[in-house]
Amino acid sequence: MAKGLDLLRWRGDIVSNNVLVLYPGNWLYNASVIGFLEILSFGMDKRRIEEWLKEDGSVSIEKDIFKNVKKGKVEIPYALVCYVEFLTEGEDLQEWLEQKDKKGKSNKEKVKEYYDDMGEFGYKFVRALNKLFSSNMPYQNLVQQNDRRKFIEYVSKLSIIGEDRINKRCEICGANRVVEPENDNSLEKRLFRFDKMHSSDFGPSMVVPNSFWNYNTSLLVCPLCAYLIIHHHKALTRLEDNSEIFINAPSFKVMWYLNKYLQTVYEKGKIATTKELLGMSIIEMALKVNVQLGKWNMMNIEIVTKSNGRF
């Protein structure tokens, strides 16, 4: 397919050429958005991100975060660069590069083509994707080894994603921006059909439908949500008892500040278990981070917990 026609599959009736306005939904979607913002804050001025958080509970994300930056000979979306840098921060890549498989081939040899094209960032890129999509990782097999370059192209096109009244509705965010996978594009087929590769806890399957999605066996996912979902685990705070928690609310602004405060409290050693957190007042937490709840003070705020691998 010609490149121009391919882009038309993604571009709909764009309300704004510069921003994507997102509204809170179910907690998994909300955690995906907050996790995405958390990763962006690693590479951007946090104040810029906080300006995106609106009083009506929405978040207005500037589309230029999906535009490409040059890494060696390859152009890579800035949002993906942030994720790669976040996932590899402080790691001794040399140790990983020297590791060998059963045939004696080192990781450095296996990923040489990425170093040739991207320089040192090529090593980080492969390592980061392995941390997301390899065996026993959060999104196992969602993006496979031969999909890595296609994955870059896919994220790049999020800068032109739009909403079209004709397209089908995304069953994660509710927007009319579902893109039908190309018949010969195995990556799109995996990304745009929500199943256990997106979330081992919540993804439905043809064999075991999930009640979280009204027992549907297949769910349509828009390109944006497919990318956001691979960030949801980064919104969770892990406690000493190995449980993980996320504070959910009908406002991205409230969620951003409350979960930030939760991380700060945990790092200072003031809470170690979910039980201790439940003893704290959500309003008290909000006041401590100077979040003026205003009309939101009666909102339905909930604490989502994950223990022993289950929510």
What label would you give each PLM region?
Residues 16, 32, 41, 58-60, ...:
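Generic serine detector
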Residues 165-181, 220-235:
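Extended amphipathic secondary-structure runs
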Residues 163, 173, 243-247:
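Beta-strand elements within well-structured catalytic alpha/beta cores of enzymes
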Residues 36, 42, 66, 86, ...:
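Phenylalanine-focused residue identity feature
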Residues 2-172, 179-183:
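N-terminal alpha-helical interaction blocks
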Residues 166-167, 174-212:
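Short recognition patches in nucleic-acid-associated and regulatory proteins
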Residues 195-311:
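Domain-exit/linker segments immediately C-terminal to small folded modules
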